[in-house]
Amino acid sequence: MDVRRAQEIASSPVMANVTYNGQRIYIEHVDQQKGVATIHPLDNPNQKQSVPVASLEEHS
């Protein structure tokens, strides 16, 4: 995924189907300069982590 699309998803009120390492996640914040996103698994909001945006996959 590119940084621009990750930012669009993070800003959208519509929930997108995005995964990180096969697990569905929620994008909390995108740092466009560093190319990283703060995410958490849908089933565990307390498990926040920063990951490269390129490692996120959007599914339709």
Curated annotation (Swiss-Prot):
Could you confirm whether the keyword NADP appears in this record? no
- Pfam families on file: SspH (PF08141)
Lineage runs: Bacteria, Bacillati, Bacillota, Bacilli, Bacillales
A GO BP entry is: asexual sporulation
Residues of the signal sequence?
A: none
Map out region (Disordered) in residue numbers: 39-60
Induction note: Expressed only in the forespore compartment of sporulating cells.
Origin: domain of life: Bacteria
What are its GO cellular component terms?
Answer: endospore-forming forespore
Q: Which family does it belong to?
A: Belongs to the SspH family.
Write down the InterPro entries for this protein, in alphabetical order.
Answer: SASP_SspH
Compartments, as annotated in UniProt: Spore core
Under the heading NCBIfam families, the entry gives: PRK03174.1, SASP_H
Kindly give the HAMAP family that the UniProt entry links to this protein. Answer: SspH
**Which UniProt keywords are present, listed alphabetically?**
Sporulation
Q: What is this protein called?
A: Small, acid-soluble spore protein H 1
